[in-house]
Amino acid sequence: MAKGAREKIKLESTAGTGHFYTTTKNKKTTPDKMLIMKFDPKARKHVEYKEIKLK
């Protein structure tokens, strides 16, 4: 079976609350690290989430 191009990643809040989302991304089309605005329920506002490697 062929291995897919998508890799699991973890998006961690930059607000320092420890909240994170998990998702996948295509390494070929998006080689850079993701930086995306998402809602942090602990901070109760939209903050930037940075990509870190899923362990």
Curated annotation (Swiss-Prot):
Disulfide bond residue pairs: none
Single Gene Ontology BP annotation: translation
Molecular functions per Gene Ontology: structural constituent of ribosome
Entry keywords, A to Z: Ribonucleoprotein, Ribosomal protein
Pfam family, one: Ribosomal_L33
InterPro entries named in the record: Ribosomal_bL33, Ribosomal_bL33_sf, Ribosomal_zn-bd
GO annotation, cellular component aspect: cytosolic large ribosomal subunit
Cited PANTHER family: 54S RIBOSOMAL PROTEIN L39, MITOCHONDRIAL, LARGE RIBOSOMAL SUBUNIT PROTEIN BL33M
HAMAP family documented for this protein: Ribosomal_bL33
Stated family: Belongs to the bacterial ribosomal protein bL33 family.
Protein name (database record): Large ribosomal subunit protein bL33
Organism: Polaromonas sp. (strain JS666 / ATCC BAA-500)
Gene designation per UniProt: rpmG
